[in-house]
């Protein structure tokens, strides 16, 4: 009690062991002193590095700009805007999935003093999963095995934490054949997809070869979704949004192209 944790020499020897134990159980990493050079120091930065893209990191700033003497920070903050920039840059370095703007005047400060950073996080932070290339057949025969080639990008600096024990890889890519009413008639799960490894700047490609069991002849529309495998039949219920422009069905499937089954 009463111990000051600021400074690289003051951390408890058990800190890493206890934090590792929590992270291995699926806990996320959260710190409420981003932007504070003493309390979010080199020890904290070094600790978070090996967990980046393995567990979500959540940001909350340390300085309450309306009450705290942030001018004393080693970073040399002069204005509330400087503090917000420092917090944002710390979060960018840690690839945070979420930013906590606190409440009241702290929240207002983000929108009043640093709104461009709010806009940047909306467009750059967290995860934004986008298929930049999908090749599907235009014609196929019922009962045959087909090939679908698809490639995915993450446009955000964070990651999609499908690898945490609580989610247990329950989100996957699935393709569907839609009828004229945009209803899913047949769906195919690509179980080899792992959304947690989709990292910004490193597109991930897959070659999927499902077999068309019992597909009736006719014209359909190909569609793709990031499905929740714990719902529906395991391959037909959209779970996560796709960050793409295009035509989506009411149930969240991104329409691709028409296909004829002979």
Positions of predicted regions on the chain:
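Compositionally biased, intrinsically disordered low-complexity regions enriched in proline and serine
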Residues: 6, 40-41, 48, 71, ...
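Catalytic cores of secreted or luminal carbohydrate-active enzymes
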Residues: 84-137
């Amino acid at each position: 009690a009463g111990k000051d944790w600021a400074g690289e020499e003051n951390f408890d020897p058990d800190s890493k062991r206890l934090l590792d134990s929590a992270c291995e159980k699926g806990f996320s990493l959260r710190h409420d002193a981003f932007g504070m050079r003493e309390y979010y120091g080199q020890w904290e930065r070094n600790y978070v590095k090996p967990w980046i893209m393995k567990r979500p990191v959540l940001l909350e700033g340390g300085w309450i700009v309306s009450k705290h003497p942030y001018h004393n920070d080693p970073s040399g903050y002069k204005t509330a805007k400087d503090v917000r920039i420092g917090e944002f840059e710390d979060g960018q370095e840690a690839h945070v999935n979420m930013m906590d703007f606190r409440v009241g005047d702290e929240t207002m400060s983000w929108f009043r003093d640093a709104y461009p950073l709010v806009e940047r996080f909306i467009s750059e932070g967290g995860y934004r999963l986008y298929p930049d290339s999908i090749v599907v057949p235009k014609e196929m025969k019922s009962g045959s095995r087909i090939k679908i080639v698809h490639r995915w990008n993450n446009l955000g600096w964070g990651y999609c934490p499908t690898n945490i024990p609580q989610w247990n890889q329950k989100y996957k890519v699935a393709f569907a054949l839609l009828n004229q009413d945009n209803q899913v008639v047949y769906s195919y799960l690509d179980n080899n997809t792992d959304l947690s490894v989709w990292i910004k700047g490193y597109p991930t490609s897959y070659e999927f070869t499902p077999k068309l069991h019992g597909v009736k002849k006719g014209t359909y529309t190909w569609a793709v979704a990031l499905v929740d495998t714990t719902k529906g039949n395991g391959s037909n219920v959209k779970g996560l949004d796709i960050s793409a422009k295009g035509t989506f069905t009411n149930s969240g499937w991104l329409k691709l192209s028409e296909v004829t089954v002979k």
